Amino acid sequence: MKVGIVSWGAYIPKYRIRTEEVARIWGDDPLRIVDVYLVDEKSVEGIDEDAVTIAVEAARRAIRRAGIDPKKIGAVYAGTESKPYAVKPISSILVDALGLSNNVFAVDMEFACKAGSEGLVAAIGLVKAGQVEYGMTVGTDTSQGEPGEHLEYSASSGGVALIVGRDGVAAELEAVYSYVSDTPDFWRREGSPYPMHGEGFTGEPAYFRHIIGAAKGLMEKYGYKPSDFAYVVFHQPNGRFPVRAASMLNIPMEKIKPGIVVTHIGNTYNASALMGFAKVLDVAKPGDKILLVPFGSGAGSNAFVFTVTDVVQERQKTGVPTVEDMLRDKIYVDYAQYLKMRKMIKLFD
């Protein structure tokens, strides 16, 4: 039974702050910072935006692109690290905001930056089992970085929604694989406004071990070679990590470059790999194979292989904004505006 991505929708807030502007405030060398992280600028949510509004907009675009009745969506999953409420699901808000049926499975997923991709696994399972006609997952974040700390140069905002189904599949799922371990690379305790990270744990023991473990494990299990893929998309905490991961897997740069978005919008956390995936789907051709490998701290990676079908051409002509459209549509803000828009200026009586 053919199961896969029926539609996709993305949303990137139009506001941007340049890396050099953040570096100016903290006295860092902007050229060195850009060279280290390969992030020129990052997206910033508007004063009236949060992870929920971003998720709603991305999901509306996915539904519009699919051209389906939203009431046919029988499951909705939301993955985020930046919930507006400590106790109140985003998924239930999506049900009413999108006009879904009340007879729907709705869950907020938890696994750092790969919670949205865990929703994809769950949606695929329900559709494949015949329990729902369509399932949706949304990866959305307004990610946090402590002022003056290096995460501030990349932590950004954005969202991606994927609709899974059996009919009208634009990218058919061929294989999925997972690699997980208890690795304390990144965390945020209850009540803490900003996350902490384990410095040396974030690279080799966390990102590379799990990205490579998932991608290599999938290829070995199912017999894929790097040459089989037209596009490869990894989680993008910065501009260097995905390029290095590709090199470690002998994947040429031309296969990974089309899905790189971090240079222009920073690390959108749960939307990071999914944003690159959406960007690739915007231009992919029938027959193309796509390797998608999200990563979540704590730590784990899922690896997916999709084959693009003829339906993708119809989906690409719906007039829904592409990721490239949103990368070009931007308004720059200074650091003071950035603090205001991110509600980081606290007033006390």
Curated annotation (Swiss-Prot):
<feature type="binding site">
    <location>
        <position position="244"/>
    </location>
    <ligand>
        <name>(3S)-3-hydroxy-3-methylglutaryl-CoA</name>
    </ligand>
</feature>
<feature type="active site" description="Acyl-thioester intermediate">
    <location>
        <position position="113"/>
    </location>
</feature>
<dbReference type="Pfam" id="PF08541">
    <property type="entry name" value="ACP_syn_III_C"/>
</dbReference>
<feature type="active site" description="Proton donor/acceptor">
    <location>
        <position position="81"/>
    </location>
</feature>
<dbReference type="InterPro" id="IPR016039">
    <property type="entry name" value="Thiolase-like"/>
</dbReference>
<keyword id="KW-0808">Transferase</keyword>
<feature type="binding site">
    <location>
        <position position="240"/>
    </location>
    <ligand>
        <name>CoA</name>
    </ligand>
</feature>
<comment type="similarity">
    <text>Belongs to the thiolase-like superfamily. Archaeal HMG-CoA synthase family.</text>
</comment>
<dbReference type="InterPro" id="IPR013747">
    <property type="entry name" value="ACP_syn_III_C"/>
</dbReference>
<feature type="binding site">
    <location>
        <position position="297"/>
    </location>
    <ligand>
        <name>(3S)-3-hydroxy-3-methylglutaryl-CoA</name>
    </ligand>
</feature>
<comment type="function">
    <text>Catalyzes the condensation of acetyl-CoA with acetoacetyl-CoA to form 3-hydroxy-3-methylglutaryl-CoA (HMG-CoA). Functions in the mevalonate (MVA) pathway leading to isopentenyl diphosphate (IPP), a key precursor for the biosynthesis of isoprenoid compounds that are building blocks of archaeal membrane lipids.</text>
</comment>
<dbReference type="GO" id="GO:0019287">
    <property type="term" value="P:isopentenyl diphosphate biosynthetic process, mevalonate pathway"/>
</dbReference>
<feature type="binding site">
    <location>
        <position position="29"/>
    </location>
    <ligand>
        <name>(3S)-3-hydroxy-3-methylglutaryl-CoA</name>
    </ligand>
</feature>
<keyword id="KW-0012">Acyltransferase</keyword>
<dbReference type="InterPro" id="IPR004656">
    <property type="entry name" value="HMG_CoA_Synthase"/>
</dbReference>
<feature type="active site" description="Proton donor/acceptor">
    <location>
        <position position="235"/>
    </location>
</feature>
<feature type="binding site">
    <location>
        <position position="267"/>
    </location>
    <ligand>
        <name>(3S)-3-hydroxy-3-methylglutaryl-CoA</name>
    </ligand>
</feature>
<comment type="subunit">
    <text>Interacts with acetoacetyl-CoA thiolase that catalyzes the precedent step in the pathway and with a DUF35 protein. The acetoacetyl-CoA thiolase/HMG-CoA synthase complex channels the intermediate via a fused CoA-binding site, which allows for efficient coupling of the endergonic thiolase reaction with the exergonic HMGCS reaction.</text>
</comment>
<dbReference type="Pfam" id="PF00108">
    <property type="entry name" value="Thiolase_N"/>
</dbReference>
<comment type="pathway">
    <text>Metabolic intermediate biosynthesis; (R)-mevalonate biosynthesis; (R)-mevalonate from acetyl-CoA: step 2/3.</text>
</comment>
<feature type="binding site">
    <location>
        <position position="202"/>
    </location>
    <ligand>
        <name>(3S)-3-hydroxy-3-methylglutaryl-CoA</name>
    </ligand>
</feature>
<feature type="binding site">
    <location>
        <position position="235"/>
    </location>
    <ligand>
        <name>(3S)-3-hydroxy-3-methylglutaryl-CoA</name>
    </ligand>
</feature>
<dbReference type="GO" id="GO:0004421">
    <property type="term" value="F:hydroxymethylglutaryl-CoA synthase activity"/>
</dbReference>
<dbReference type="InterPro" id="IPR020616">
    <property type="entry name" value="Thiolase_N"/>
</dbReference>
<dbReference type="GO" id="GO:0010142">
    <property type="term" value="P:farnesyl diphosphate biosynthetic process, mevalonate pathway"/>
</dbReference>
<feature type="binding site">
    <location>
        <position position="113"/>
    </location>
    <ligand>
        <name>(3S)-3-hydroxy-3-methylglutaryl-CoA</name>
    </ligand>
</feature>
<protein>
    <recommendedName>
        <fullName>Hydroxymethylglutaryl-CoA synthase</fullName>
        <ecNumber>2.3.3.10</ecNumber>
    </recommendedName>
</protein>
<feature type="binding site">
    <location>
        <position position="154"/>
    </location>
    <ligand>
        <name>(3S)-3-hydroxy-3-methylglutaryl-CoA</name>
    </ligand>
</feature>
<keyword id="KW-0414">Isoprene biosynthesis</keyword>
<dbReference type="GO" id="GO:0003985">
    <property type="term" value="F:acetyl-CoA C-acetyltransferase activity"/>
</dbReference>
